[in-house]
Curated annotation (Swiss-Prot):
General function of this protein: Binds the 23S rRNA.
PANTHER family, per the entry: 50S RIBOSOMAL PROTEIN L31, CHLOROPLASTIC, LARGE RIBOSOMAL SUBUNIT PROTEIN BL31C
Protein name: Large ribosomal subunit protein bL31
Pfam families for the chain: Ribosomal_L31
Length: 77
């Protein structure tokens, strides 16, 4: 027989707050959840994401050790 009273209390209508305003309700073991980011204000989901043109770590490594194919072609010429 399962043990009694070992499961946390379930709140099927837990309120989720972002910046002091209620944004949605979900099921949770906490009655209220406070979040910094949610799908309504995240840049990826709102379409305001900015593409930052930065060099990746792999490209930086390859350039540092001269392993990029484009760099080898320039150095051989």
């Amino acid at each position: 027989m399962p043990k009694a009273d070992i499961h946390p209390q379930w709140y099927p209508e837990a309120k989720v707050y972002c910046n002091g305003e209620e944004v949605m309700t979900v099921g949770s073991t906490q009655p209220e959840l406070h979040v910094d980011v949610w799908s309504g204000n995240h840049p990826f989901y709102t379409g305001t994401q900015k593409i930052i043109d930065t060099e990746g770590r792999v490209e930086r490594f390859l350039r540092k050790y001269g392993m990029l194919e484009g760099d080898q072609a320039k150095s051989e010429a």
